[in-house]
Swiss-Prot record:
Belongs to the CcmF/CycK/Ccl1/NrfE/CcsA family. Keywords: Cytochrome c-type biogenesis, Mitochondrion. This is Probable cytochrome c biosynthesis protein. It comes from Oenothera berteroana. Could be involved in assembly and maturation of cytochromes c. May play a role in guidance of apocytochromes and heme groups for the covalent linkage introduced by the cytochrome-c-heme lyase.
């Protein structure tokens, strides 16, 4: 085996390491191994260009001086995709090393953490798994009705729908009503037992569903999953349709073609890596936003948080000064319009039965809310949480859920701000260098009638500029997540347009329609997943706003109860079950 083949197989080694590294090691360990393996493959391609190894097809068709031989490594389709993968693996390593997740060891609930690419690979092998169902049904085996990805999706859907009990899917598992109870799910008709012992390895397809505490500790791993999942796709795309170590079937001592003289420019040699670095940084921001949406959808409606919120609201009602005993959470979690069916609050005291008195006090309660008597307390508490990112576990006494303030803390949106600034800076440098090249190579008109391929990098720059103005806000809004997602999707769309033949240019890579099909499917997949997650997040946000309206009415009643208690300290009958 030659040294060139060793460089070729190092890319396979990087993918293998990402799957099978020891789970007792931190996630940065596996990301570092994948980074060094891809770097070795990239250095091998660079060595082929520098040494004029004419056995490689890309070297044979791109003869140039020494400096442009180095830049010729990424001046073709195969080398540019390999550079993309290497930068993405490097960014993933930085994310792992900076995050330093502390929950990489064995879980207390049993089972090891999943591998980096586990959930992402299931998207690609889902069709293959479903194709096995026909074979199992023909052989009279128990059919597997659901893939792990579908099961995990149903688990999250069950957690989101625990409030209204409107889950229409199969009852795969029952979510616990209390945090101390374990929750798990298994395959329908699975023949392997689930290992429930602590510290033992659990079969991947029969893993335990995590509660809110364990889900919060795995946020860092979910961020890394998305980044290395994108690297996985581009690696498979590179090996399937864009092999960068294509060998010639004949011996040749001299190159057959020269590199395009228009591309032999020192500015244009530095321009592509800057554009790729900016595009890959947008991919990291996309992964962070995807992780935030996936965790936010489940966290806002998990049963333990609803129980904690109910207890806090009950203590708030007790502190109003009109209740002499503790109110249970089951009583307060009922809808406010149904409270009157089971209890008689202080609104029905004998001294307060006058409709005019009720109307006057209700108006007085709403006026207090309008002036900020109760809302200001929640705002000040939220400001303290947002300004101090380290204390992200603090919650407002008037918040509707225990996890509402932790979602919008500065500590959570700091990585998004860093990566979107990185994307914007690299795109700035790349676009300025490309504009300079177009000016002195194509004339003054080249500055305005720019190359259409370079315009593909201008769309992400505009969106990144808009995202910078949105991410500097103290709270992380949904528009920030949407702009981050669309920025990465524009990068993928620009890559597809360049490498599929939609845009004709001097340095386009349109040589095969198969590459465009791969990239188009990847673009549709990322767009579909992003829109589904974003729509679910907005749906949960609308439920939250509806619940907040109910809480406004409840808090106004608390103000009325306080004044009623002052008017009559000892009521005859306050609550009746």
């Amino acid at each position: 085996m030659s040294i060139v083949e060793l460089f070729h197989y190092s890319l396979f080694l990087g993918l293998f390491v990402a799957f099978t590294y020891n789970k007792k090691e931190p996630p940065a360990f596996g990301a570092a191994l994948a980074f060094w393996c891809i770097l070795l493959s990239f250095l091998g391609l660079l060595f082929c260009h520098i040494s004029n190894n004419n056995s490689n097809y890309n070297v044979l068709t791109a003869n140039a001086p020494f400096f442009y031989q180095i830049s010729g490594t990424w001046s073709n389709h195969e080398g540019s995709i390999l550079l993309w993968c290497w930068i993405l693996s490097f960014y993933g390593f930085l994310l792992c090393y900076r995050g330093r997740p502390q929950s990489h060891n064995v879980s207390k609930r049993g089972g090891y953490r999943e591998t980096f690419f586990y959930f992402f690979v299931l998207n690609f092998v889902k069709n293959f798994i479903l194709s096995l169902l026909c074979y199992e049904q023909k052989t009279l085996a128990v059919p597997q009705l659901y893939t792990p990805f579908v099961l995990r999706t149903l688990v999250d859907s069950e957690l989101c729908s625990r409030r209204n009990r409107t889950f229409d899917g199969p009852a795969l598992f029952y979510a616990p009503l209390y945090p101390e109870r374990k929750m798990s799910f298994a395959f329908l008709g699975a023949r392997l037992p689930v290992v429930r012992g602590e510290g033992k390895r659990t079969y991947l397809l029969l893993h335990l569903a995590r509660d809110d505490k364990e889900r919060a500790s795995s946020i860092d791993e979910q961020r890394i999953d998305g980044a290395l999942g994108i690297a996985l796709f581009f690696s498979f795309f590179l090996l399937a349709s864009s092999d960068f170590f294509v060998r010639n079937f004949f011996v040749c001592t001299e190159p057959l073609a020269e590199l395009n003289p228009v591309l032999q420019d020192p500015i244009l040699a530095i321009h592509p890596p800057c554009i790729y670095a900016g595009d890959v940084a947008s991919a990291m921001g996309f992964c962070l936003c995807r992780s935030k949406m996936m965790n936010g959808i489940v966290a806002l409606h998990s049963p333990p948080m609803w129980k904690d919120a109910a207890e806090k609201n009950g203590r708030l009602l007790c502190s109003a000064g009109c209740v002499g005993f503790r109110i249970t959470s089951e009583l307060f979690t009922l809808k406010f319009k149904d409270v009157g069916a089971k209890c008689y609050p202080a609104l029905l005291l004998r001294s307060n039965r006058s409709p005019l008195m009720l109307l006057r006090r209700r108006f007085f309660a709403f006026s207090l809310l309008w002036t900020g008597a109760l809302v200001d307390t929640g705002r000040e508490q939220a400001k303290r949480v947002v300004r101090n990112g380290k204390k992200d576990t603090a919650t407002s006494p008037l918040s509707w859920t225990a996890g509402a303030n932790t979602v919008v803390s500065d500590q959570d949106q700091e990585p998004i701000r860093i990566w979107i600034l990185t994307c914007w800076c690299f795109l700035n440098v790349g676009i300025l260098l490309g504009s300079w090249w177009a000016y002195h190579e194509l004339g003054w008109g080249g500055w305005w009638f720019w190359d259409p391929v370079e315009n593909a990098s201008f769309m992400p720059w505009v969106l990144a500029t808009a995202c910078i103005h949105s991410v500097i806000l103290p709270l992380l809004h949904s528009c920030t997540l949407l702009i981050n997602i669309v920025t990465f999707l524009c990068c993928v769309l620009g890559t597809f347009s360049i490498r599929s033949g939609l845009l004709a240019s001097v340095h386009s890579f349109a040589t095969d329609d198969t590459r465009g099909i791969f990239l188009w499917r990847f673009f549709l997949l990322m767009t579909g997943i992003s829109m589904i997650l974003f729509s679910q997040m907005k749906q949960q946000a609308s439920v939250r706003r509806t619940y907040q309206k109910e809480m406004v009415v409840a808090r106004s009643t608390l103000v009325h109860l306080r004044h009623s208690a002052r008017a009559q300290p000892r009521p005859q009958l306050l609550w009746k079950n």
